[in-house]
Structure formats: C-alpha cells, structure tokens
C-alpha cells in the first residue's frame, strides 16, 4: 500500500462548509469530516485565530491512523498551516519534523518553508544527519528516509547559511529532484550563478517532469539569467509562465524604490507576452 502524499479532497466532492463549520468539524468524532475540514481551511486560507489554533491542535492527533501507521489528519493540518501564514504554528510544525510519518515531516518542512522562520533551522538541519550516504530509499516504500527536497528548499528559503556545508553534498545525490532542491537552496543562500546554471542545465534534459521541477525552482529563486532558457524550455507554457512570473516578482521587489521599470523586468514581461 502506497500512502498518498497529496490532498485528496476536490472541493466538489466534499460537504459545503463555512469557516465556523470547518473549525467545528475539526473537533468532530467523524474522522472524514476532520480530514476534510483541515484541507478546506488551508485551501480557502481561513486565517482566523480559531482556525489556526484548531489546526495546531490537530498536529498532535492520534485518532486518524492508516494501516501503515500514517497520520492523515496531521498531514492536512500541517499543509494548511503553511498556507495560513501564521508563525504561531512554527513550534508545532517543528515538532512534526520528528513524527514517524514521512508525509507529516514532508508537509511540516514545506510549511516551514512558507513561513520562513529561522527558528526552524536547527530542526530542519537535523534531518540531514548522515548526509548523502544515509539519504537512501526506505525498503518497500516510494520515498527516501527523509523528505530531503522539502528540507533543502526550506533551509534555502529561511536563509540558513549555517547549513551550506551540509546542503552542498546533496548536489551529488543520485536522485535528480534532490539535486535540484540542493541547487535551489545553494543559490538562495549564496546568490552564486553556478547554482542557478545547474537548474538551467536541467531544462535541456530529457525528463519532462524534471524540467517542470527546474522551472518551478528557477521561478522560486528568481534567477533572472534563466529568463530565455525558461521561455524556450520544452514544457507546457503554463509552467513557463509561472516560472517567469516568479522572476518578475523577484525583480520588481528588488526595484521597489525605483522610479521606472528596468529593462530586465520589461524583457521578462515580453517573454511572458510571447507565451500567451
């Protein structure tokens, strides 16, 4: 049995909720209602204090378990808390990094990336213990021993420069997606173009899914030198537009005090127009 790591409740298949009802449902004895409520609160960005508190409490749920020992409600609660943007959730998410459920740890790392709280760095770094040599696949499972992609991306996003010596070896990890995550983090932490160029190189590869990953990474780090390579990549325009939008947002943020739009920003806009 492979446990899913993604949310499984399309809105049209679930009950109609209001924020108040969703918060109440998190206390329900019906596990399916609780699971859906956690997903719904994240999906619709319900940022009320009561919602945040209820989701934080759900991170410690023991009732909703899979046959393999997973914690589905905890997973959805962890994912939702990242979307709500409240740093009150950080301590609970840090605790989730020690959960025996891989997918809870992954969701917690992804949300800590969104929240960008530096206090999470030591706990995230701990998940890199053993380095590349220990970063192997779990026997009989579809994942590695730790959610390395999410951990590396989180460390990059929160600016954990102390982790650079631990992240760099993952550029040589045998799993290409982990290599991409390491390159993404290294660029964020050093701003050295060599790491951005590693991601650009992936765009020329034969694996479409990996090209999509690299597009997302380049957009996330705002590597402006990749603009043309992104526009010309062999991938769906929707992925390329999202990546270019990321570049543009980074550039506009850097130019927030400028009186006019730079030529570089205009260049990205023109590339986006060419894909529409």
UniProtKB/Swiss-Prot annotation:
Coiled coil: none annotated. Keywords: Antenna complex, Lyase, Phycobilisome. Transmembrane segments: none annotated. Gene3D superfamilies: Leucine-rich Repeat Variant. It is an enzyme of class 4 (lyase). The keyword Endoplasmic reticulum does not apply. GO terms for molecular function: lyase activity; oxidoreductase activity. CpcE and CpcF associate to form a lyase. Belongs to the CpcE/RpcE/PecE family. This is Phycocyanobilin lyase subunit alpha. It comes from Nostoc sp. (strain PCC 7120 / SAG 25.82 / UTEX 2576). The lineage of its organism: Bacteria, Bacillati, Cyanobacteriota, Cyanophyceae, Nostocales.
């Amino acid at each position: 049995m492979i446990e899913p790591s993604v949310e499984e409740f399309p809105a049209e298949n679930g009950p109609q909720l209001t924020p108040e009802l969703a918060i109440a449902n998190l206390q329900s004895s019906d596990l399916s209602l609780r699971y859906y409520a956690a997903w719904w609160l994240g999906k619709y960005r319900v940022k009320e204090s009561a919602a945040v508190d209820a989701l934080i409490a759900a991170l410690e749920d023991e009732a909703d378990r899979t046959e393999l020992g997973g914690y589905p409600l905890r997973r959805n609660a962890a994912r939702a808390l990242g979307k709500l943007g409240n740093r009150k959730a950080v301590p609970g998410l840090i605790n989730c990094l020690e959960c025996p459920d891989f997918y809870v740890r992954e969701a917690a790392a992804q949300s800590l990336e969104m929240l960008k709280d530096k206090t999470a760095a030591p706990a995230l770094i701990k998940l890199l213990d053993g380095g590349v040599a220990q970063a192997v696949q779990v026997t009989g499972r579809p994942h590695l021993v730790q959610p390395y992609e999410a951990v590396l991306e989180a460390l990059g996003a929160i600016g954990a420069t102390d982790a650079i010596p631990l992240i760099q070896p993952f550029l040589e990890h045998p799993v290409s997606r982990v290599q991409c995550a390491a390159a993404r983090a290294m660029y964020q932490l050093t701003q050295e173009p060599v790491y951005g160029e590693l991601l650009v190189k992936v765009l020329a590869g034969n694996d479409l899914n990996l090209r999509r990953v690299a597009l997302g990474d380049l957009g996330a780090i705002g590597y402006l030198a990749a603009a043309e390579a992104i526009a010309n990549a062999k991938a769906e325009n929707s992925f390329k537009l999202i990546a270019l939008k990321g570049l543009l947002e980074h550039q506009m943020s850097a130019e927030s005090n400028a009186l006019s739009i730079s030529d570089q920003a205009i260049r990205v806009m023109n590339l986006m127009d060419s894909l529409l």
